[in-house]
């Protein structure tokens, strides 16, 4: 089939055999195209076993599969789970018929340093070993909770800067990567100094951090929220967070989308992550829309939830020999993001998972 690659605008001839792209070649300008394609959507911050459509009382494996099924139906063909209360998602890694799932094992936090019952709790002396263990038995990632609420309900780092740096260095020595949950200024600065591979949420990230993040290769996953600071602060207020902290949160979260756009312009890798589990699943397209609304060019905002994210995760795109993961649209979503909600075809590993009512023949071998 002849298509236009959304990332580059190239006209390509694609052939699929045995679940992979058997041919990806530049096409001439003559002839009609079957649509516009990207290598699937990707959510780099998704907790599959939390807030699952299966319900909180279902078994972990059932919760994970229900969440993954919902995401797949929307075209999420790859996702990273940066921390989980269990290991159920690891069963999907490499299993045919499911999104490409990269896990980070259990959340790592000190006693009392995260929401009750969610984290593997370790003291600072054991953090490096625990991070190494989680990365080794997961998808090569570890997730460290960098800060949380203290007794005064103020956000404060969970670890010393030295302790965090040691843990990240240990994982890096073994070839792994580390995502750090960081909200407050001190936790953000410690994560950057420790060369975290990604900062999750990053409420306190400012323009002053961009150069160091770019140099370290630290990506930012802002997990923007529909409703912005009002939504976040309403949740925080229910936890008894004092007025001065709520006001800081309101300002920080309210500025996030614009800061993310400036970070992108400065060369920081900004990626789309929904934080599904904290809220409902199935919101990756909303995340693209929020990134674009903040000022990231629409094509780049799509990339943050597709080709840019896949490259960051070490997954191939549309190339000869790669798994045939792609979505075809009848128009270019960079010109109208609403097109992302109307896929003509979702293909995973060469298998058509979803079609529009009148699909264009793609020549995919089932």
Regions found by a protein language model. Name each.
Residues 154-257, 265-266, 271, 276-278, ...:
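Active-site core of metal-dependent hydrolases
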Residues 44, 51, 60-176, 216-229:
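Divalent-metal coordination cores built from histidine and acidic residues
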Residues 19, 34, 42-45, 75, ...:
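Divalent metal-coordination and catalytic microenvironments
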């Amino acid at each position: 089939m002849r298509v236009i690659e959304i990332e580059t605008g190239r006209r390509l001839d694609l052939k699929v055999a045995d679940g992979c792209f058997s041919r990806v070649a530049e096409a001439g300008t003559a002839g009609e195209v079957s649509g516009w394609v990207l290598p699937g959507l990707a959510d780099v911050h998704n907790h599959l076993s939390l807030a699952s459509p299966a319900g909180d009382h279902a078994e972990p494996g059932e919760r994970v599969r229900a969440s993954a099924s919902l995401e797949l139906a929307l075209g999420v063909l790859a996702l990273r789970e940066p921390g989980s209360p269990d290991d159920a998602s690891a069963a999907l890694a490499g299993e045919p018929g499911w999104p490409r799932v990269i896990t980070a094992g259990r959340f790592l936090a000190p006693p009392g340093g995260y929401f009750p019952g969610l984290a593997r709790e370790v003291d600072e002396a054991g953090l490096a070993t625990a991070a190494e263990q989680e990365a080794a038995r997961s998808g090569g990632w570890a997730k460290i909770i960098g800060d949380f609420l203290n007794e005064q309900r103020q956000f404060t780092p969970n670890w010393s800067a030295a302790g965090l740096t040691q843990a990240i260095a240990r994982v890096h020595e073994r070839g792994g990567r580390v995502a750090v949950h960081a909200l407050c200024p001190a936790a953000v600065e410690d994560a950057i100094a420790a060369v975290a591979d990604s900062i999750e949420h990053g409420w306190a990230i400012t323009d002053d951090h961009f150069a160091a993040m770019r140099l370290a290769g630290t990506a930012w996953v802002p997990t923007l929220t529909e409703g912005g600071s009002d939504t976040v602060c309403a949740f925080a207020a229910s936890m008894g967070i004092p007025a001065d902290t709520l006001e800081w949160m309101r300002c920080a979260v309210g500025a996030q989308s614009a800061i993310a756009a400036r970070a992108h312009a400065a060369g920081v890798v900004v990626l789309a992550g929904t934080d599904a589990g904290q809220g409902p699943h199935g919101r990756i397209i909303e995340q693209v829309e929020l990134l674009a609304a903040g000022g990231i060019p629409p094509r780049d905002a799509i990339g943050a939830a597709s080709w840019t994210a896949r490259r960051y995760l070490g997954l191939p795109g549309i190339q000869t020999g790669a798994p045939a993961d792609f979505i075809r649209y009848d128009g270019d979503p960079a010109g109208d993001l609403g097109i992302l909600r109307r896929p003509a075809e979702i293909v995973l590993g060469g298998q058509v998972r979803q079609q529009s009512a009148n699909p264009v023949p793609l020549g995919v071998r089932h």
